[in-house]
Amino acid sequence: LSAYITALTKSVQWALDLGEFYSPAQIDIAKKVLTEAERRVALLARGEEDWTRKTGLVVRGYYSSIDDSPQPYGLEIPEGFDFSKPAPLYVWLHGRGDKTTDMHFIHQRMTRQGQVAPENAIVVHPFGRHCMGFKSAGEIDVLECVQHVSEHYKIDTRRIALMGFSMGGAGAWHLGAHYADQWVAVGPGAGFAETKEYIKLQTEDYPAEYVQTLWGMYDVPNYVRNLFNLPTIAYSGELDKQIQAAQVMERAYQAEGAKLPHIIGPGM
């Protein structure tokens, strides 16, 4: 079956198996997701589909190369969008949401607009395996999600921007630094950029040396020079503790003789 269907049905099955209903009212969420899956099955049975040219909020899916599982993602496509012309793609990485598992993520993407709404552009919301910080399988899911969108829509590959806030900001930092050739610009908000300072680890509590070495996989200051190849603009709230991520990266930029553009919201 198409991942456009199985991503939906899997999400409800997992919610049942793993106890991801947090109030009786959320039974209605499962019903809405299954109703949409049933509608799509009926369309495919008639040799039809309506999601490739739909505007507004669209939920699609693809099969992961990691484990062949159906993974959902959300799209926001402006009304009156011209599907015949190459368009910019904005990749928005979501923040942490402990209860926003597959089914709840899908329902959000069916019903709730996101944080950015650029004109004449598509916004994609990767799921990224829930709350993995867009690392490991979550990292690959973002890349495969972008690839899937690019295969099914006319995307101007020179104008793919990466953005995110909180945990999504952390994902934007490390995906931006690791894959700087994939993006036209990166906009990380809040989040975290490394391990040791973020968790306030004291020297006496450091783990084994090999664990510290493994931090290097995702500690973004190690890769800061990659970010010199594209516009990278951090943004933070003045009072938000997660301003720490941008401050760490400001120091990393300074160590290389560069300056990080950093927008700070006063009193926020």
Regions found by a protein language model. Give the residues of each.
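Amphipathic, heptad-repeat alpha-helical segments
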Residues: 1-5
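A domain-start/cap signature at the N-terminus of enzymes
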Residues: 18-87
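Gly/Ser-rich "nucleophile elbow"/oxyanion-hole loop immediately N-terminal to the catalytic nucleophile
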Residues: 79-85, 133-167, 177-183, 226
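Active-site machinery of serine-nucleophile hydrolases
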Residues: 85-153
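Mobile cap/lid helix-loop segments that gate and shape the active-site cleft of serine hydrolases
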Residues: 97-109, 181-230
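Short beta-strand immediately N-terminal to the catalytic nucleophile in serine-hydrolase-like folds
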Residues: 162-164, 189, 235
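Hydrolases whose catalytic domains are alpha/beta-hydrolase-1, hotdog thioesterase
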Residues: 171-175
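C-terminal catalytic histidine-bearing segment of alpha/beta-hydrolase fold enzymes
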Residues: 235, 239-268
